[in-house]
A protein has these predicted regions:
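Mobile, glycine-rich extracellular loop/lid and propeptide segments
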Residues: 1-211
Length: 211
């Protein structure tokens, strides 16, 4: 049986991805380059269960980390493809050089805002190549990478509004100028947002109430 289906369209190549879990054991990753007329697939082995909250994304190669090879060689896919998921107390993220056919590099993001119930793997990419993850933690935070997933940094925000107990998933989005917007549920059950205009390096510390 399958569950947690998720779709993604690469904003640069127009490749359409379809992923879903096979229980909590492994993940099926499929893609099409002809608008669904035919599909290729990768029955990706996510390692020992439990694997949950799967997400796939893609974005430009950078000139650092995993991007050194990805952006320089014509043998690699035009964009970096990321597959992330939750493994109970931490998030796992992997990078593909071949458009999602395999995920050879990456691992568990241990020690970066992933303890305390970091139940999320919802990766988001920006046009400048920065990739973001919103962990489900007590203090609103963002994990981000500027080298296509080799290294990650953490930034916090929202200490003026906090989070509820039990916590809820947050979400992050980016715009065409690579500004980033993190949205989460505050301690009063309101929806709040913080913005970064410098590719994730700093975030508004006065939270904006959305609703």
């Amino acid at each position: 049986f399958t569950n947690d289906p998720y779709g993604w369209v690469d904003p640069i190549t127009d490749r359409v991805f379809n992923i879903h879990m096979m229980g909590l054991w492994t993940t099926w990753i499929g893609w099409t380059d002809n608008d669904g007329e035919s599909w290729e697939a990768n029955p990706h082995d996510s390692g020992a269960p439990v694997n949950d909250h799967i997400k796939l994304g893609s974005g430009p190669w950078t000139n650092a980390g995993y991007g050194i090879g990805g952006g320089a060689s014509s043998s690699f896919y035009e964009t970096a493809v990321y597959f992330c998921y939750n493994k109970l107390a931490y998030i796992s993220c992997y990078t593909s050089y071949d458009g999602g056919a395999s995920f050879e590099v990456g691992g568990n993001l241990v020690g970066i805002a992933t303890a305390n119930g970091g139940l999320h793997g919802a990766i988001t990419s920006a046009p400048d190549g920065t990739v973001y993850l919103p962990p489900r933690v007590a203090t609103p935070a963002i994990i981000f990478s500027k080298d296509n997933g080799l290294t990650w940094e953490e930034r916090t925000m929202g200490q003026d509004v906090g989070t509820p107990n039990p916590r809820k998933n947050g979400e992050i989005a980016t715009d065409t100028e690579s500004n980033a917007y993190n949205v989460w549920v505050g301690g009063d059950q309101g929806v709040y947002m913080s913005r970064s205009i410098d590719s994730g390096n700093s975030w508004d510390q006065t939270s904006i109430r959305v609703r």
